[in-house]
Amino acid sequence: MTGHSHFVSEIKLTGDSRFAFSASWDGTVRLWNVATGRTISKLIGHKRDVLSVALSSDDRQIITGSLDRDIKIWNTRSECKFTVDKNQHTDAVSVVRFYHAKKPALCVTASWDKTIKVWDNLYMTLLHTFCGHKAQVTTLDIVENSAFLASGSRDGTIMVWDIVNGKWFTKHDCDSPVNAVLFSQKLYWLVIATQTGIKVLNLPEQKFVQDELRETSLKQNESDSDKPLSCTSLAWAKNGQILYSGWSDNHIRVYEIDSSDSAQ
């Protein structure tokens, strides 16, 4: 699929996987037909790079966050229906997400201003502002069947929050800037991708199961091949037992979770 004129920052598929939305540093979001690979429409309205995009559970609403600090709500006709104009973030909006367990749904946004905000999706009224990180918030993940929200930051910490009641739950130092966080509902783990590897936090026991899974470059002729690589992205297979990870050496590494609760 081609069409964007700059980096693609995030992609979200609709529930039936027939369509995809892509956010880009070119300031637009594109709606794609997955089967044909063609652009159906473009969401135009942000003044700078679009850093994140998310879809509502019925695929009828799209939320976007941008370097221009704006949060926008769109419909499937690519019309911007609302731009948040009160209690906005004071820096780039790095992550946007929907939370569907509560009715009406909530929107969650993270920013380079070091905060996370929770909004009522019906009127985009601010409900909570989470403070605690000391640098840009780079990643969020939500457990849909609970009230847990995890955040990761360039300050090298992860925090877990109660998204409904607006309370802080726990904080852990990962000793390295955090690129991605991902809950495992099967094992009550939080998997953390950092600039130096992968950590696995057992949430009930509040201790690291895997500290720390590091990888080095597969290119033996590189002068820095013995230095730890950065893990940049994480995704679970549908069965929750296989973890896919993207790394800074252009490789995808796959890990299987064994019965003794350790990554192999």
Which role fits each region the language model picked out?
Residues K12-S17, A54-R60, R97-P104, D141-A147, ...:
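Loop/turn segments within WD40 beta-propeller blades
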Residues R38-S41, K81-T83, T125-H128, K167-T170, ...:
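A structural motif specific to WD40 beta-propellers
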Residues V29-W32, I71-N75, V96, I116-W119, ...:
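WD40-repeat beta-propellers
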Residues T2-V8, I44-V50, K86-V93, C131-V137, ...:
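WD40/WD-repeat beta-propeller blade N-cap
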Residues A23-D26, G65-D68, T109-D113, G152-D155, ...:
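Conserved strand-to-loop turn within each blade of WD40 beta-propeller repeats
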Residues V34-G37, T76-E79, N121-M124, I163-G166, ...:
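Short loop/turn segments that connect beta-strands within beta-propeller blades
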